[in-house]
From Swiss-Prot:
Presence of keyword Transport: no
Keywords: Amino-acid biosynthesis, Cobalt, Diaminopimelate biosynthesis, Hydrolase, Lysine biosynthesis, Metal-binding, Zinc
Record's function text: Catalyzes the hydrolysis of N-succinyl-L,L-diaminopimelic acid (SDAP), forming succinate and LL-2,6-diaminopimelate (DAP), an intermediate involved in the bacterial biosynthesis of lysine and meso-diaminopimelic acid, an essential component of bacterial cell walls.
InterPro entries: ArgE/DapE_CS, Bact_exopeptidase_dim_dom, DapE_proteobac, Peptidase_M20, Peptidase_M20_dimer, Peptidase_M20A
Catalytic residues (UniProt): D69, E134
Gene: dapE
Cofactor(s) of this protein: Zn(2+); Co(2+)
Descriptive protein name: Succinyl-diaminopimelate desuccinylase
Family: Belongs to the peptidase M20A family. DapE subfamily.
Organism: Xanthomonas campestris pv. campestris (strain B100)
Catalytic activity: N-succinyl-(2S,6S)-2,6-diaminopimelate + H2O = (2S,6S)-2,6-diaminopimelate + succinate
């Protein structure tokens, strides 16, 4: 017999919600949560669906945060089975979103239903927040909802994000923060000319090389708590016409910083602009701020999560701030303590994405235990 969480996960996977599409996932979830007594509010913006569902009232406010969108699967022929036709083989569920993160979303729903059935008059507020704009631009999703919450004065005390955080077994890692992310697109201007007459041209590659070398060599910090040191990586670089006898007129450089709480986007931007100015470059520089770092220090949420995950996994979890960004970066500035707890992440964004059925079926109890420890 198929378990409730497995069936719901399959129903969600079958809805091909490639970002920013939701494909009916949130309507299905809202129907279930409404039937369980949750008040559901749809906060759609443009092509993005956002769902805010609450049960109870007052403080403390505990939010289960997730996303219903998925990354594109690529050619279906590369998959062993249709990425949007979920299939269980040898105790493993395959399909796009199985691990990232429709399994966690389904487990949130089942855990929330079970919790309010057992504790209909529970203290505080249990909330579920879902978006279809996590894997894409992340502008009209939780970023937008967080702005609405700030305007409303919506308090959030604790936030559990269901991102796939585990590495080898369910519960072996507890995400307690994330680095900030800042991207820059730099264009260094020169003067195009013939390579035989360099005195009549200005080579932007040569002009920029010392500045780029300084950026790459810089030790930005030594890390922070469990954060690795801030890192700057050049991701793309382009210049030239394709001909080997033409000095290019401009150099294009794309770079990204993943940074610790020692910094914020504004201070990093100032540092880099000052460096470029010292090298007397003629340039333009466009920034994209993906999110500031966040960190949950030792406290109730972190202690409870460590104890619950340790009981489930059989050993205390590693407490980490690694990985990319998540939507928790938009909730943390509201004053919330944020953690991330979810299934094994080995196959996310890959062909034949999958999750162990045993892990999936354990997730609702894991989330329900966290909710009970925090609210009851």
């Amino acid at each position: 017999m198929t378990s409730d969480v497995l069936q719901l996960t399959c129903d969600l996977i079958a809805r091909a919600s490639v970002t920013p599409a939701d494909a009916g996932c949130q309507a299905l979830i809202a129907d279930r949560l409404s039937a369980a007594g949750f008040a559901c509010e749809h906060l759609r913006l443009g092509a993005v669906d956002n769902l805010w569902a609450t049960h109870g009232s007052g403080a403390p406010v505990l939010v289960l945060l997730g996303h219903t969108d998925v990354v594109p699967p690529g050619p279906a022929s590369d998959w062993a089975s249709d990425p949007f036709a979920p299939q269980v083989r040898d105790g493993v569920l395959y399909g796009r979103g199985a691990a990232d993160m429709k399994g966690s979303v389904a487990a949130f729903v089942v855990a929330a239903e079970q919790f309010v059935a057992a504790h209909p008059e529970h203290p505080g507020t249990l909330a579920v927040l879902l978006t279809s704009d996590e894997e894409g631009d992340a502008i009209d999703g939780v970023r937008h909802v967080a702005r609405l919450f700030a305007e409303r004065g919506q308090q959030i005390d604790w936030c559990i994000t269901g991102e796939p955080s585990s590495t080898e077994r369910l519960g072996d890692l507890l995400r307690v923060g994330r680095r900030g992310s800042l991207s820059g697109n730099l264009i260094v201007k020169g003067v195009q000319g013939h390579v035989a007459y360099p005195h009549k041209a200005r080579n932007p590659i040569h002009l920029a090389a010392p500045a780029l070398a300084e950026l790459i060599a810089r030790q930005w910090d030594d890390g922070f708590e469990s954060f690795p040191p801030t890192s700057l990586q050049i991701s793309n670089i382009h210049a030239g016409t394709g001909a080997n006898n033409v000095i290019p007129g401009e150099l294009q450089v794309a770079f990204n910083l993943r940074y610790t709480p020692h910094w914020n986007a504004e201070t990093l931007e100032r540092e880099i602009v000052a460096l470029l100015e010292r090298h007397a470059l003629t340039y333009t520089l466009a920034w994209h701020r993906s999110g500031e770092p966040f960190y949950t220090p030792e406290g109730t949420l972190r202690r409870v999560a460590r104890e619950v995950l340790g009981a489930f996994a059989g050993a205390p979890p590693e407490e980490s701030t690694g990985g990319g960004t998540s939507d928790a970066r938009f909730i943390a500035p509201l004053g919330a303590q944020c953690i991330e707890v979810g299934p094994v992440n080995a196959s996310i964004h890959q062909v034949d994405e999958h999750v162990r059925v045993a892990d999936l079926e354990a997730l609702p109890a894991l989330y329900r235990t966290l909710v009970e420890r925090l609210l009851v």
